Amino acid sequence: MQKTLDVVAAIIEQDGKILLAQRPSHADQPGLWEFAGGKVEAGESQPQALIRELQEELGITAQVERYIASHQREVSGRLIHLHAWWVARFSGLPGAHYHRQLRWCTPQEALTFDLAPADIPLLNAFIAQRAAGLPR
């Protein structure tokens, strides 16, 4: 039976730009760019897991604002259910505690990065919601 993981990802937005993080060399899909986040642990809600992961990976205290979209993909023999959430408010300065580097860019610029495949549909959903004028 294939292992299934629930994973959360943050589309962190500030001043019209979103934060991308480059995966470290020791991780799956090394060097690809992604939205920061991680696995949902037993007993956690998705927003709780995201707050914890952003504290661990970036050193920020985030306020999870709104659900964006989900995507399912097989990665390294595991079925990943990836759920994106919008984060527009946080305290602290994001730092690359886990990732190689961080980069702020517009959502359109993000499409030019070598993104982790599972994150592309989430970015497209975010861009579509912005184009539809959904509230910020």
Where are these regions (language model features)?
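Active-site-adjacent beta-strand/loop module that shapes the phosphate/pyrophosphate-binding cleft
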Residues: 61-63, 70-94, 103, 107, ...
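Charged phosphate-binding loop/patch that engages nucleotide di/tri-phosphates or the phosphate backbone
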Residues: 118-136
